[in-house]
């Protein structure tokens, strides 16, 4: 399953991405993708992005060549034109996937978009442009029985770009905070328009009216909540208390029970087609 973790900045997206990656790595092989500006997931996993790290934003030409797209042409042509597209695989690793993946441990590999890299400064591309390869890589990635966790950019902007059309589920992290709830609702509405399954995880729970309101209003899509745990603050997975471990089991069980495999490439093709229609209006 390919799962993108989204939400308001500071809601706990990167921490949730780390928790799920570590939890799932106990049973599956996991591909963790850091698609955020801050590159916190990479840091939490103990990886340092350097000048020579092969990130998505540094392999544009190579990716375009692999998918048969001439340089300096619209990326949407990848899915809008009749062409034979490659399939990328996580296990076994295809050549391209292997070239941009870094082994964190025997069960977790990491890919990084690179939005926080120093060479982004003065770049002619915006964050959308730098994320282009990932956008078209995701629906072409065959994960098999493995799991893919993507730590997304804060807010709803990347949904407007269609970055997550290639995922099986969007999981919004929401905390009992008015702005966090506002962004969560924006994400929910956009996901519905894009026909991407959307679920929620309550983070930093505390008893107040907003907490109760969120639990009631979104009870049909909430997978569970992550309790306060000192080990989470210290990024000590082995030190998680029993309540946190049980919460992660419940969240994963809920997500699995709702999972329906769909053609994500067709979803991206539909998105780009509608986008092209809007552009000529």
Name what the model sees in each region:
Residues 236-248:
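C-terminal boundary of histidine-terminating zinc-finger modules
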Residues 86-105, 111-148:
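Cytosolic-facing regulatory segments adjacent to core modules
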Residues 23-106:
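N-terminal phosphate/diphosphate-binding loop that engages ATP/GTP or pyrophosphate donors
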Residues 5:
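Hydrophobic anchor at the beta1->P-loop junction of P-loop NTPases
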Residues 16:
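Hydrophobic positions on the alpha1 helix immediately C-terminal to the Walker A/P-loop
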Residues 13:
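Conserved lysine of the Walker
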Residues 8:
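P-loop (Walker A) phosphate-binding loop of NTP-binding proteins
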Residues 19, 26-27, 126-234:
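Conserved catalytic-core segment of NTP-binding enzymes
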């Amino acid at each position: 399953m390919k799962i993108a973790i989204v939400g308001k900045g500071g809601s706990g997206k990167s921490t949730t991405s780390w928790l799920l990656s570590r939890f799932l790595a106990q049973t599956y092989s996991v591909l963790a993708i850091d698609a955020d500006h801050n590159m916190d997931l990479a840091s939490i996993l103990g990886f340092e992005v350097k000048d020579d790290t092969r990130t998505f934003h540094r392999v544009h030409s190579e990716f375009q060549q692999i998918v048969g797209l001439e340089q300096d042409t619209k990326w949407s042509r990848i899915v809008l034109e009749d062409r034979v597209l490659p399939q990328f695989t996580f296990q076994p690793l295809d050549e391209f996937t292997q070239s941009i993946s870094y082994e964190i441990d025997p069960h977790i590999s990491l890919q990084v978009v690179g939005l926080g890299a120093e060479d982004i400064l003065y770049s002619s591309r915006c964050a959308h442009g730098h994320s282009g390869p990932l956008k078209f890589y995701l629906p072409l990635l065959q994960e098999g029985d493995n799991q893919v966790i993507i730590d997304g950019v804060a807010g709803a902007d990347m949904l407007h770009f269609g970055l997550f059309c290639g995922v099986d589920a969007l999981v919004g992290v929401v905390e009992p905070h008015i702005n966090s709830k506002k962004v969560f609702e924006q994400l929910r509405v956009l996901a519905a328009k894009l026909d991407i399954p959307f679920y929620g995880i309550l983070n930093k729970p505390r008893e107040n009216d907003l907490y109760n309101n969120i639990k009631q209003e979104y009870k049909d899509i909430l997978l569970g909540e992550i309790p306060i745990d000192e080990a989470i603050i210290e990024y000590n997975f082995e030190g998680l208390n029993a309540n946190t471990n049980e919460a992660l089991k419940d969240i994963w069980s809920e997500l699995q029970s709702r999972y329906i495999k769909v053609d994500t490439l067709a979803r991206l093709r539909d998105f780009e087609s509608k986008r092209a229609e809007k552009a000529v209006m």
